[in-house]
Amino acid sequence: MPELPEVETTRRGLQVHLVGRTLQRVVVRQRQLRYPVPARVEAAVVGEEVVALERRAKYLLIRLGGGAWLLLHLGMSGSLRLVAETDAPGRHDHVDLVLNDGRAVRLTDPRRFGCLLLGDGDPQDHRLLRRLGPEPLGSAFDGAVLHRAARGRRVAVKALLMDATVVVGVGNIYANEALFRAGIRPDRAAGRIARARYDRLAGAVRAVLEAALAAGGTTLRDFTDGSGEPGYFAVNLSVYGASVCPVCGGALRQIRLAQRGTWFCPRCQR
């Protein structure tokens, strides 16, 4: 699944090509995504200038000059790529946002768990956005946020870290990596972790995500950035999918937490 670094990499790659352009038309080949593509989207955005391309959590927000906006999510296997308008679509190319320069932003989604929604007003009031927690790379996120959310809870700390109402964008790969950097077992009860350790964990989350952004995201199966290039952070993963601890040389343990593969070092993580 494209996680926060992958979505932000896509945003950065497309922003320079999209902002300031006009949407000439929208081509919808498949409406049945996670949520149906609105029937009025084609008529609503034609002739509108793109004034901003933003990200909130794992959602991309295309703001248009007339006040409307498009909200996109890449789902489990989706991507957005800049292509020539004349490029023949593939089987899983479901939507084209055609620009006034002969190019199009193409939504590809083999598993159809992504979405393209239309709205106006404040997008932060949308039902998909309004309950989201702070951005992990923003000033509102720190150890205090995690410590408050964990108070009195027996849930595993990894599950807390992946709860988008606590902090957004920390998916399975990066939760594994951040907990390793912070020296915290992923199955430890969240409410039994001291504030100082949460300070360390918040710093580890930031460091892991910043490193992934610098590398262009993590490619495991489907992710490509806005130009179709893969991300390269997978070569820098410390524990996710690995068998040997890079610090102590001991064997890593693999367990399942909340139905997700989880790796940790029983020596280095307590």
UniProtKB/Swiss-Prot annotation:
InterPro entries registered for this protein in UniProt: DNA_glyclase/AP_lyase_DNA-bd, DNA_glyclase_Znf_dom_DNA_BS, Formamido-pyr_DNA_Glyclase, FPG_cat, MutM-like_N-ter, Ribosomal_uS13-like_H2TH, Znf_DNA_glyclase/AP_lyase, Znf_FPG/IleRS
UniProt keyword annotations, A-Z: DNA damage, DNA repair, DNA-binding, Glycosidase, Hydrolase, Lyase, Metal-binding, Multifunctional enzyme, Zinc, Zinc-finger
Zinc finger (FPG-type): 238-270
Gene Ontology terms for molecular function: 8-oxo-7,8-dihydroguanine DNA N-glycosylase activity; class I DNA-(apurinic or apyrimidinic site) endonuclease activity; damaged DNA binding; zinc ion binding
EC number(s) given by UniProt: 3.2.2.23, 4.2.99.18
GO biological process, one term: base-excision repair
SMART domains: Fapy_DNA_glyco, H2TH
Cofactor(s) demanded: Zn(2+)
Residues that coordinate or bind DNA: H92, R111, R153
Gene3D superfamilies in the record: 1.10.8.50, MutM-like, N-terminal
One Pfam family this sequence matches: zf-FPG_IleRS
Disulfide cysteine pairs (residue numbers): none
Catalysed conversion reaction: Hydrolysis of DNA containing ring-opened 7-methylguanine residues, releasing 2,6-diamino-4-hydroxy-5-(N-methyl)formamidopyrimidine; 2'-deoxyribonucleotide-(2'-deoxyribose 5'-phosphate)-2'-deoxyribonucleotide-DNA = a 3'-end 2'-deoxyribonucleotide-(2,3-dehydro-2,3-deoxyribose 5'-phosphate)-DNA + a 5'-end 5'-phospho-2'-deoxyribonucleoside-DNA + H(+)
Matches recorded under PROSITE patterns: FPG_CAT, ZF_FPG_1, ZF_FPG_2
Active site, renumbered: P2 (schiff-base intermediate with dna), E3 (proton donor), K58 (proton donor), R260 (proton donor)
Cofactor info, note text: Binds 1 zinc ion per subunit.
Subunit: Monomer.
Function: Involved in base excision repair of DNA damaged by oxidation or by mutagenic agents. Acts as a DNA glycosylase that recognizes and removes damaged bases. Has a preference for oxidized purines, such as 7,8-dihydro-8-oxoguanine (8-oxoG). Has AP (apurinic/apyrimidinic) lyase activity and introduces nicks in the DNA strand. Cleaves the DNA backbone by beta-delta elimination to generate a single-strand break at the site of the removed base with both 3'- and 5'-phosphates.
Family of the protein in this entry: Belongs to the FPG family.
Protein name: Formamidopyrimidine-DNA glycosylase
